[in-house]
Amino acid sequence: MDIDVIIPVYRPGEDLVALLNRLYAQTVEIHKIILVETLDEEEKTSMEEETSAENSLLLHLQKQYKKIELYSVKKEDFDHGMTRRMAVEKSDADIFVMMTQDALPADRKLIEKLTAPLMGDIAVSYARQLPRKNCRAIERFTRRFNYPE
């Protein structure tokens, strides 16, 4: 079964690089990673005007990781549900995993554990997001409140 990972991104940085590294190290192969970048109007204009788009982190990552597909939406068109739905429509996989750009897999078995229940009669599987080790107190509280053990 093919598995795609869908990640909306906004002003991506090193967190996204770390996430991609961990996704490519998973025990279950990922068919493709669909990134949907939200762009401010000025960012979209400057990217279109650049003669060398090589400076874009996402374009660099797409070259480094061959299974990445890039899409973009304008900031004013971004909607949590509709943006993800658009990405799902770009997927041809049997299973898709939705992630956020700041959620790092704690181990190499995240995709395996998330998708294993879907091989049977289960339609949805989910995981909790742990706080980062060096996070602020508010992030630690929010993660523990939203995703209790």
Q: Where is each model-derived feature located?
A:
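Cell-envelope/extracellular polymer assembly enzymes that use nucleotide-activated donors
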Residues: D2-D4, K32
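Short, well-formed alpha-helical segments that are part of the catalytic scaffolds
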Residues: P12-A25
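Acidic donor-binding segment of Leloir-type glycosyltransferases
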Residues: R22-S72
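Glycine-rich, basic loop-to-helix element that forms the pyrophosphate-binding segment
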Residues: K74-S91
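Short aromatic/hydrophobic "clamp" motif used to bind/position activated sugar donors
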Residues: F96
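The conserved acidic donor/metal-binding loop of glycosyltransferases
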Residues: T100-L104
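Conserved donor NDP-sugar-binding/catalytic core segment of glycosyltransferases
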Residues: R108-E139
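Short, flexible, basic/aromatic active-site loop/helix in glycosyltransferases
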Residues: T142-E149
